[in-house]
A protein has these predicted regions:
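N-terminal onset of structured domains
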Residues: 25-70
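Glycine-rich, aromatic-bearing surface loops/beta-hairpins
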Residues: 139-190
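N-terminal secretory signal peptides that target proteins for export/translocation
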Residues: 1-7
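Bacterial N-terminal signal peptides
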Residues: 9-20
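A beta-strand/beta-hairpin structural motif
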Residues: 48-52, 103, 114-116, 124-142
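Short structured motifs
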Residues: 32-38, 58, 94-96, 136-141
Length: 190
């Protein structure tokens, strides 16, 4: 009886310990999310502006220091809600940046993979700050929007490790190497 009670108690306590350990691990995990985003018309083009929080895990920082690049992917969708029909997709845009470390120059290099533009930074903090501020990114032509209608703009960021074969990524603890934000959605009315 006593042994059964001890075994039962152990099985009742273990789930609570697992929940506490998970909460502790999540509390220490660096913040990764979208803090703010908006679009504004400029010169006939709607432009995206956003501020991201790009906290890297220790594993991602170590991989970066060893020369493995990280890729930031920004997915943007614009849709028009309709009453009795499915939403109409107006535009989709995927923007990609690669963050790498150049050991020879001792610089962190950010490359916009869509345009080829690149910049070098002295520290990882400077490079992450530059990546975290999306400014005047052309999203869609104003002629695609109807005046007075309401549109939903959705934004999601993904940070993943690059340069490793898929077979190797599967062997690694995936949560450490890829992070995805929830969709950040807001309405606009041209």
């Amino acid at each position: 009886m006593r042994r059964t009670l001890r075994c039962l108690t152990r099985w009742m306590v273990l789930p609570w310990l697992a929940v506490a350990a998970l909460a502790h691990a999540q509390a220490e995990e660096p913040r990764f999310g979208i803090r703010n985003a908006f679009v504004e018309p400029r010169g006939g083009v709607w432009q995206l502006n956003a501020i991201l929080e790009l906290g890297l895990s220790r594993a991602a920082e170590n991989a970066l220091a060893e020369g493995v690049p990280l890729t930031l992917i920004l997915d943007t969708e614009v849709s028009r809600g309709r009453r009795f029909l499915p939403d109409e997709d107006v535009a989709e845009l995927q923007q990609r940046w690669q963050l790498g470390y150049d050991g020879l120059a001792q610089r962190y290099v950010v490359v916009n993979q869509n345009s080829g533009a690149q910049a070098a930074y002295a520290s990882l903090g400077e490079a992450l700050d530059a990546l975290a501020r999306i400014r005047e990114l052309p999203l869609l032509d104003e002629s695609l929007l109807q005046a007075g209608r309401r549109y939903e703009v959705s934004l999601r960021a993904t940070l993943e490790i690059g340069g490793l074969p898929e077979a190797v990524k599967v062997l690694l603890f995936w949560r450490e190497w890829s992070r995805v934000t929830d969709w950040y959605t807001w309405s606009v009315r041209p």
